[in-house]
C-alpha cells in the first residue's frame, strides 16, 4: 500500500526501518559513550602521572638535558662549524633527549613499578591496558619537551643555525616520543624488575643512537649499519626532525612519518600485550 505521497504505508516495512534506525543510533551512542569513557580514563591516569612529578620535574629536565648538551658541545668543538654538521648535531641531540625521556626513563619507571605491586593497585580500577600505557607514554613525551626546546633554542641563537620549524615538526616530535616510549614500555613490561629494566634500557639507548644516522649522515656509516639502521626508529626520528626544522619536508619525510606511525602502533600494542596487572597473569 502507498499513501497519498506515493510512499509505502506497510506497517511491517516501517517497523523494520524504525528498528534499523534505532539500532544504528544505539551503536553510534554506545560508541560515543565508550570513547568518552576511555577519554576520562586517559585524563585521570595522565593527571595522576603528572601529579607525581610535581616535586621532581626540575631534576628530570636537568637529567634529560645534560647528556645531549654535553654531547652537542663536544661535537661542536670536534666537527667544526659547518651548517650541515651543526644541523646533524642539534637534531641528533634532540633525538638523544627523546630517547632518554621516552625510552630509557619510561622503561626503568615501569620496571620499578613492578616491585611494590603498583600494577595490582591499578588493576582495582576499571581501566583498559592500552589507555594506561598511553598515559604513561604521554607523561614521557611531555617530559621531553623542555629539554628539546632548550636544545633547539641553543642551536638557533648560540650556534646560529637557521631553523624553520613548522606544524610538521610538532607532529614528528609527538610521533617520535610515542614510538620511543612504546619501545621503553615494552622493555619495562618484559623485564623482571626495575634493575633488569634499567640495565636493558641503558644497553639499548646507545645502540639506537650511535648505530643509526642520528649524528652523522647515513652514507658515512659502515655498509652493514646502513642496512640494519633501517629497522631502528631513531633513523626516521632524526631524519624527519632534520628535514622539518630545515624547512625541507619532502615525500621522503612523509614516508618516514608514516613509518613512525607504524612503529608507534606496533610497540604500544606489543607493550599492552606484555602488561600483566598481577604477577601470576
Segments predicted by a language model, with ranges:
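Hydrophobic transmembrane alpha-helices and immediately adjacent juxtamembrane helices
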Residues: 2-167, 171-179, 183-209, 213-236, ...
